[in-house]
């Protein structure tokens, strides 16, 4: 059983929902990323982590995460360097489940089998590839399955029912349930029909459902916990990193862990 499945099994046993921060790898550098991941584990501030691989043209990310990626790219961060960092962290005792958010072009460039083999070897537990349609993901899905890695797929409010059914029949690990139409970013409230939409995905899914996009406050996390199996927070965390980008890695890591504990407080009450 991989770490993703094991984490959700443990959470079910404990009667808890998952808190999953999105961390833009290499923002502002990989030393900070390493410090953040270690601190999240040491303080119990995350149940799983979504680790974003910097890309110059992310299709689903708003200005905050785009800026995070630009800072990482300016620092010379590459997919190879991200994977190597994870490998060193695993060797040092990091056990948090890590799901990689990565553009398909970065997976395709070295060859899909080679990329997945490397990711599995360093301890990546699943891939989220937002720009690869489910209809074209069969070869990747087979390779991920052979590597015991989760193939995490996204559904959105605009996903047609037939396509949603197809996605839910292929996903493993968890369903990434996009809360709003559009790109990532902090929002004041969920859109009309949000509860009905998430309940519908949850009812049809055979794996856990985690909601992301627009979650930036403890009350958002609390609302998601009533409907789904976990909450994913990204832009608020990238903002916190940007606000402290001139600080030492340990300071930035503390700031991120503080925010994660604040946001996830409703899941522990």
Residue ranges and their predicted role:
Residues 14-20, 92-103, 144-154, 202-213:
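Short beta-strand/loop segments at the ligand-binding rim of alpha/beta enzyme cores
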Residues 47-56, 124-128, 133-136, 175-185, ...:
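Glycine-rich phosphate-binding active-site loops on the catalytic face of alpha/beta enzymes
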Residues 199-205, 216-226, 230-269:
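Alpha/beta catalytic cores of nucleotide-metabolism and tRNA/nucleoside-modifying enzymes
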Residues 174-181, 185-230:
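Active-site/ligand-binding-proximal alpha/beta "capping" segment
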Residues 21, 52, 119, 167, ...:
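Conserved, mostly hydrophobic/aromatic
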Residues 24, 101-109, 133-134, 155-159, ...:
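Glycine-rich beta-to-alpha transition loops that act as phosphate-gripper elements at the mouths
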Residues 1-11, 30, 55-66, 74-89, ...:
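Active-site-adjacent beta->alpha loops and helix N-cap segments on the catalytic face
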Residues 30-42, 159-169, 211, 215-231:
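Catalytic cores of alpha/beta
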